[in-house]
């Protein structure tokens, strides 16, 4: 089942989510528009198993990264009609 990983602009570039992910779904990418110079990205969401360790590790308390599991993806992201 496919999961969506959404990185929000409240990401502080701390790398905690990247280090917490057991399957390397996340990585840090350069971003000039951020004071840390980097932001989390999720290029390999097809490998996400939905463990949500990235959410738990985030020091912004789920404000920067969210994992939407399978069926809840469109509903939770506000995409359902």
Swiss-Prot record:
4Fe-4S ferredoxin-type domain residues:
2-31, 39-68
Q: Name one GO cellular component term.
A: plasma membrane-derived thylakoid membrane
Q: Where does [4Fe-4S] cluster 2 bind?
A: 21, 48, 51, 54
| UniProtKB keywords | 4Fe-4S, Electron transport, Iron, Iron-sulfur, Membrane, Metal-binding, Oxidoreductase, Photosynthesis, Photosystem I, Repeat, Thylakoid, Transport
Q: Which compartments does it reside in?
A: Cellular thylakoid membrane
Q: How does it sit in the membrane?
A: Peripheral membrane protein
Q: How is the cofactor bound?
A: Binds 2 [4Fe-4S] clusters. Cluster 2 is most probably the spectroscopically characterized electron acceptor FA and cluster 1 is most probably FB.
Read off the PROSITE patterns from this record.
Answer: 4FE4S_FER_1 (PS00198), 4FE4S_FER_2 (PS51379)
Q: Which reaction does it catalyse?
A: reduced [plastocyanin] + hnu + oxidized [2Fe-2S]-[ferredoxin] = oxidized [plastocyanin] + reduced [2Fe-2S]-[ferredoxin]
Residues at which [4Fe-4S] cluster 1 binds: 11, 14, 17, 58
Query: Main EC class of this protein?
Result: oxidoreductase
- The UniProt record lists the keyword Nuclease: no
Gene Ontology BP terms: photosynthetic electron transport in photosystem I
| Major localisation | membrane
Cofactor(s) recorded for this entry are: [4Fe-4S] cluster
One of the entry's Gene Ontology molecular-function terms is: metal ion binding
| Cross-referenced Pfam families | Fer4_7 (PF12838)
Which Gene3D superfamilies does its entry note? 3.30.70.20
Is Nucleus one of the keywords?
no
Q: What is its EC number?
A: 1.97.1.12
Function statement: Apoprotein for the two 4Fe-4S centers FA and FB of photosystem I (PSI); essential for photochemical activity. FB is the terminal electron acceptor of PSI, donating electrons to ferredoxin. The C-terminus interacts with PsaA/B/D and helps assemble the protein into the PSI complex. Required for binding of PsaD and PsaE to PSI. PSI is a plastocyanin/cytochrome c6-ferredoxin oxidoreductase, converting photonic excitation into a charge separation, which transfers an electron from the donor P700 chlorophyll pair to the spectroscopically characterized acceptors A0, A1, FX, FA and FB in turn.
Q: How does it assemble?
A: The cyanobacterial PSI reaction center is composed of one copy each of PsaA,B,C,D,E,F,I,J,K,L,M and X, and forms trimeric complexes.
Q: Do you know which HAMAP family this protein is assigned to?
A: PSI_PsaC
Q: Which named protein is this?
A: Photosystem I iron-sulfur center
The gene is: psaC
